[in-house]
Amino acid sequence: MIKLHILEIATGLEAHAVRYAAEHWGISVTVTWVGNSQQIVDCLSSYPDCDLILISGHGDERGLILPELAEEVSSNYPYRDVISHDDFAKFLNLNNSVVINSSCMGGVQSMAEVFLDKGAKCYIAPKDFPLADASLMYLLKFLYEYVKNNKDIDKAHDLALPQDERELFTLFK
């Protein structure tokens, strides 16, 4: 059985929609409802035992945006506002997982290189700011083609890409 782990970082219903669809298609799904940066570090530094990892979050040119915490709380965690590609390089330890990062700007070359260098089988993310609906539709179509229809990663990506009319999701290998 294919295993998917979702890191949900304040994205509303995206993670719920992906989880329900994935479970319907026979994927074993676990979710971390991220409240602080240590949870991301713990998950992605521990050689996760899953075939697919979905980082369901928000991003910008700085990197993955973290949940806003009060100063007295955020000082207890390794990263505050954002986790950059340089930060990810310090703790990632992946287990040949397919990593999909739905956060805006997650598909910049420097971020992709870090994930690949640290053990991702491949890395998929948008290179700019996709519309939220397009992002969700890409995720659902990719999972459907990859898991349910047994397409290889390249073919599943090619079939899912038109769901985002601006075709911002990029596959890095």
Feature names for model-found ranges:
Residues 1-52, 102, 114:
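A domain-level signal for caspase-like cysteine endopeptidase catalytic cores
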Residues 13, 61-62, 132:
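Flexible, glycine-rich phosphate/dinucleotide-binding loops
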Residues 19-22, 66-70, 114-117, 138-140:
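Short, glycine/charged-enriched secondary-structure capping and boundary segments
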Residues 21-26, 44, 92, 146, ...:
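Hydrophobic, Leu/Ile/Phe/Ala-enriched alpha-helical segments that form helix-helix packing faces
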Residues 23-27, 50-53, 72-75, 118-122, ...:
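Short, low-complexity, polar/charged sequence segments that are solvent-exposed and flexible
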Residues 31, 55-58, 78-80, 123-128, ...:
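Glycine-rich loops and low-complexity Gly/Arg-rich segments
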Residues 32-105, 109:
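Catalytic-core segments of thiol-dependent peptidases
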Residues 98-173:
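Active-site-proximal C-terminal subdomain of hydrolase catalytic domains
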